[in-house]
Swiss-Prot record:
The lineage of its organism: Bacteria, Pseudomonadati, Pseudomonadota, Gammaproteobacteria, Lysobacterales. It catalyses: UTP = 3',5'-cyclic UMP + diphosphate. Induction: Expression is probably induced by infection with phage T7. Mn(2+) 2 binds at D51, D95. GO terms for cellular component: cytoplasm. Residues 46-178 form the Guanylate cyclase domain. Keywords: Antiviral defense, Cytoplasm, Lyase, Manganese, Metal-binding, Nucleotide-binding. InterPro entries: Nucleotide_cyclase. The keyword Membrane does not apply. Homodimer. The gene is pycC. Pycsar (pyrimidine cyclase system for antiphage resistance) provides immunity against bacteriophage. The pyrimidine cyclase (PycC) synthesizes cyclic nucleotides in response to infection; these serve as specific second messenger signals. The signal activates the adjacent effector, leading to bacterial cell death and abortive phage infection. A clade B Pycsar system. The pyrimidine cyclase gene of a two-gene Pycsar system, generates cyclic UMP (cUMP) from UTP probably in response to bacteriophage infection. Expression of this and adjacent effector XpPycTIR (AC P0DV29) confers resistance to bacteriophage T7. When cells expressing the Pycsar system are infected phage T7 at low multiplicity of infection (0.2 MOI) the culture survives, at 2.0 MOI bacteria enter growth arrest. The same cells enter growth arrest after exposure to 2.5 mM cUMP but not cCMP; the effector protein responds only to the cUMP produced by its cognate NTP cyclase. Belongs to the adenylyl cyclase class-4/guanylyl cyclase family. Pyrimidine cyclase subfamily. Coiled coil: none annotated. This is Uridylate cyclase.
Length: 231
């Protein structure tokens, strides 16, 4: 079969085939029983995106090995904090990481992870960087976005070169939130409504500010510059 015929057959089969969906109990991965045909897993999940801000300027203005050290330390801290809060890293994309939280208190755990990442940047990564490079003025800036919804997970790509696609509002909104100013962590209203009190207030003071997402349908979102100490 020639390449044109192969592509035509595949597209015909996808558009005309029935979907076989199962309800997920665990975070799907590449070993899940998903195929390149119309198979999918549905799962209720909270998506966290953590993204470095200004990475283009960093790679343009600093040595490649220094940029790599920033990537490595930031993404390592993100991954370990996410895991400690019961989340699962589902993808790395250059200078950012996507993670999924499922089960009880998934929104609270995701929000807590975001605040811990902020603390780690300020209290671990930057002090270690400054101690090693005393004349280097680089300041690591980052932003985290979180949303929650029911996700439709399918396998995309071709044999030997494929990945999972997370279809649903949460993956898109969480990623878009990271385009907002890096001073804050951002969550959607859906996430905020599901937060436990411990992730909403501290000593009677709100940890979140209600704002309007002017560049995205004037949606209501919440932002926070609070941090969560890691012991």
């Amino acid at each position: 079969m020639g390449l044109k015929d192969e592509l035509t057959t595949f597209c015909h089969d996808v558009f005309n085939g029935n979907w076989e969906t199962t309800e997920g109990k665990n975070v799907p991965d590449e070993d899940s029983r998903l195929t390149l045909k119309n198979t999918a897993i549905t799962i209720d999940g909270t998506v966290l995106y953590a993204d470095l801000d200004g990475s283009t300027a960093m790679v343009d203005g600093y040595k490649n090995w220094f940029a790599a050290e920033i990537y490595k330390t930031y993404l390592y801290c993100c991954a370990r904090i996410i895991a400690a809060e019961g989340g699962v890293v589902t993808a790395y994309d250059g200078d950012r990481v996507m993670a999924l939280f499922i089960g009880e208190r998934k929104n609270t755990r995701a929000a807590r992870a975001a605040m811990k990442i902020k603390w780690a940047v300020d209290e671990i990564i930057m002090p270690k960087k400054d101690a090693r490079y005393t004349s280097n003025k680089f300041a690591l800036k980052h932003v985290t976005g979180i949303d929650t919804c029911s996700l439709f997970v399918a396998k995309t790509g071709a044999r030997g070169a494929n990945d999972l696609v997370w279809v649903g509002r949460a993956a898109n909104y969480a990623a878009k939130l990271t385009s907002l100013p890096s001073t804050y962590t951002y969550i959607t209203e859906s996430v905020y409504k599901m937060l436990a009190d411990e992730a909403k207030t501290s000593n009677g003071k709100s940890m979140w500010e209600k704002v309007t997402w002017n560049t995205f349908n004037n949606s209501t979102i919440y932002r926070s510059n609070w941090r969560w100490r890691i012991d």
